[in-house]
């Protein structure tokens, strides 16, 4: 019996008690199901807490144009957002997302602590945030060279 393998291009965890959503993305576009699930989770946290933060790590993958449009339509607030990526091209492109949210800042992996500063993660929560991000990263599908 063959098992179906489902790609995981975007994974996330909501830390409601810390008013934080941590997400990790590989270098591929998220599926619409992944994106819509993430968007619903963020919207739900926003409704519950009013103020929240986003920590995103990515290997260069990003939402499609249609997904960005859904984000823009649903964006009720402009949460402080830190995007961490080793891709210089991605960080340049992502900085243009400030038209959606002026509180977005991009950081290289070596600037991870600055990313946590940007979204006001307390010293006591930093280790937990790092562990969650590392665990999420392990859940991602590694895209093949043909993707």
Give residue ranges: language-model regions:
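Amphipathic, Lys/Arg-enriched alpha-helical "gate/interface" segment within cytosolic domains
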Residues: 2-147
């Amino acid at each position: 019996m063959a098992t179906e393998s489902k790609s995981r291009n975007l994974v996330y965890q909501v830390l409601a008690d810390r008013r934080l959503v941590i997400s990790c993305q590989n270098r591929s576009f998220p599926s619409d199901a992944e994106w819509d699930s993430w968007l619903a989770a963020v919207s739900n946290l926003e409704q519950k807490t009013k103020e929240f933060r986003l920590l995103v790590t990515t290997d260069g993958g990003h939402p499609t144009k249609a997904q960005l449009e859904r984000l823009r339509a649903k964006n009720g607030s402009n949460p402080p957002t830190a995007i961490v990526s080793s891709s210089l091209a991605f960080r340049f492109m992502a900085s243009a997302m400030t038209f959606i949210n002026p509180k977005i800042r991009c950081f290289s992996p070596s600037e991870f602590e600055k990313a946590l500063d940007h979204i006001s993660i307390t010293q006591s929560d930093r280790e937990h945030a790092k562990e969650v991000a590392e665990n999420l990263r392990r859940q991602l599908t590694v895209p093949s060279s043909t993707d």
